[in-house]
């Protein structure tokens, strides 16, 4: 019997795949557990429509990420912190602080987990910080840390 997998089934098939399986296995396990549906022409059409929709959404997300990348690379985030001699900061600048300043100064909301700061910023001056907007799109954000008076 041909079935369309709704979820990944180890050793049998991945979500969205159409495969031939034993009738008993399909009726007694896959259908009852909600892991698959019968591959009727109507169900196959619905699956193809859903795949097209997901493809369109993925393309839109990629376009939005590229647009945001352009915007972010034009911006310099200005932060001030208390510093000691030689430009060393008391404390550090974290990705959370950078995200908050982006929100307050530029009205751009970015999750702090997308800001890939290997180590917190501990010195004055300019720092280039990578921001992963999409698996294929990474922007570079300029962060300028000045001394707080």
From Swiss-Prot:
One of its GO terms (cellular component) is ribonucleoprotein complex. PROSITE patterns: RIBOSOMAL_L9. It comes from the Bacteria. InterPro entries: Ribosomal_bL9, Ribosomal_bL9/RNase_H1_N, Ribosomal_bL9_bac/chp, Ribosomal_bL9_C, Ribosomal_bL9_C_sf, Ribosomal_bL9_N, Ribosomal_bL9_N_sf. HAMAP family: Ribosomal_bL9. NCBIfam families: L9 (TIGR00158). Belongs to the bacterial ribosomal protein bL9 family. This is Large ribosomal subunit protein bL9.
């Amino acid at each position: 019997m041909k079935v369309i997998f709704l979820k990944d089934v180890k050793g049998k098939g991945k979500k969205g795949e159409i495969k031939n399986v034993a009738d008993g296995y399909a009726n007694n396990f896959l259908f009852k557990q909600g892991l698959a549906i019968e591959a009727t022409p109507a169900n196959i059409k619905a699956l193809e429509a859903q795949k097209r929709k997901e493809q369109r959404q993925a393309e839109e997300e990629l376009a939005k990420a590229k647009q945001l990348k352009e915007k972010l690379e034009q911006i310099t985030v200005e932060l001030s912190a208390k510093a000691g001699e030689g430009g060393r900061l008391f404390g550090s600048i974290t990705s959370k602080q950078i995200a908050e300043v982006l929100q307050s100064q530029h009205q751009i909301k970015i999750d702090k987990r997308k800001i890939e700061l290997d180590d917190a910023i501990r010195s004055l001056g300019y720092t280039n910080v990578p921001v992963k907007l999409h698996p294929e799109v990474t922007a570079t954000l300029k962060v300028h840390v000045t001394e707080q008076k």
